């Protein structure tokens, strides 16, 4: 995947990230002493576009000062061996991919949250604030499977919640403060067709309708926001950023899932739609 393609996708996310600061959730006031170390944690969740599937080789290999990741890599999963420490933020081939044969189409390597947070650092370079970026999603999953209340999978608990608990624990060891100003949601492709193995409950198909998807998306947003407020002990709910699913995954004439995402953003104050994906080239849909 060419660098300019990744940079364009990261730019779309970064515009939305900047909007979060204007919205005010990223500047939560703290009463601690001015010399207290401050972290802001940016979490991305969803399916394969959120994780950076088919993005080999890694491009963002030089870390920027003040930007960090949890453990060995940007992904809290994908073989990450240590969720108790911070390391400088950079891209790499996922540990689960190390022994896989690499091809022009293969490899989880360049997660979009890396370039987005790096761009944010370059544009809003406040040296008093440190950024943590984490990818928590899993490729090829429906919103049903990624939901907190799914009975088929524990992806939410093993991904999003694991990262959310890790950051405050790390900050506490450093006597630092940490907030989560926003979460990014990149998903929708696998909800364009029904499958009885991909629903909220065993043997129940996943949702495919616009209203049903929007209901689950709003429920997921509320779950993530409420968990963040509780875990990080912060006053403001994190902003929720989505994109509008597209490319070859869409089905039908009414674009049910894409319209659900757009409507949710238009109707809900704390949701931003970063934009559609159709103007950007891709590799196998990524």
Language-model segments: residues:
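Cell-envelope and extracellular/periplasmic
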Residues: 29-286
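Sec/Tat signal peptide C-region and signal peptidase I cleavage site
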Residues: 22-26
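Bacterial N-terminal signal peptides that target proteins for export
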Residues: 2-12
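Bacterial N-terminal signal peptides
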Residues: 11-20
């Amino acid at each position: 995947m060419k660098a300019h393609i990744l940079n364009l996708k990261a730019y779309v996310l970064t515009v939305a990230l900047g909007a979060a600061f204007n919205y005010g959730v990223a500047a939560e006031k703290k009463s601690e002493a001015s010399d207290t170390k401050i972290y802001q944690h940016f979490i991305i969740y969803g399916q394969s576009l959120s994780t950076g599937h088919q993005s080999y080789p890694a491009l963002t290999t030089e870390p920027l000062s003040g930007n960090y990741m949890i453990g060995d890599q940007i992904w809290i999963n994908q073989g990450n061996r240590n969720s108790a420490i911070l390391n400088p933020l950079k891209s790499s081939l996922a540990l689960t991919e190390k022994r896989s044969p690499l091809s022009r189409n293969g490899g989880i390597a360049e997660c979009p949250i890396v370039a987005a947070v790096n761009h944010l650092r370059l544009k809003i370079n406040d040296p008093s604030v440190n950024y943590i970026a984490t990818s928590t999603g899993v490729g090829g999953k429906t919103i049903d499977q990624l939901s907190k209340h799914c009975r088929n999978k524990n992806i939410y608990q093993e991904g999003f919640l694991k990262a959310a608990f890790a950051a405050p624990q790390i900050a506490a060891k450093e006597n630092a403060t940490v907030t989560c100003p926003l979460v990014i949601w990149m998903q929708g492709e696998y909800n364009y067709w029904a499958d009885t193995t991909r629903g909220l409950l065993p043997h129940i198909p996943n949702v495919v309708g616009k209203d049903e998807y929007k209901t689950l998306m709003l429920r997921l947003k509320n779950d993530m926001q409420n968990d963040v407020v509780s875990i990080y002990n912060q006053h403001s709910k994190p902003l929720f950023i989505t994109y509008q699913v597209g490319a070859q995954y869409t089905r039908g004439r009414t674009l049910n899932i894409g319209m659900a995402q757009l409507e949710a953003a238009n109707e809900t104050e704390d949701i931003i739609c970063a934009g559609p994906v159709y103007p950007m080239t891709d590799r196998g849909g990524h």
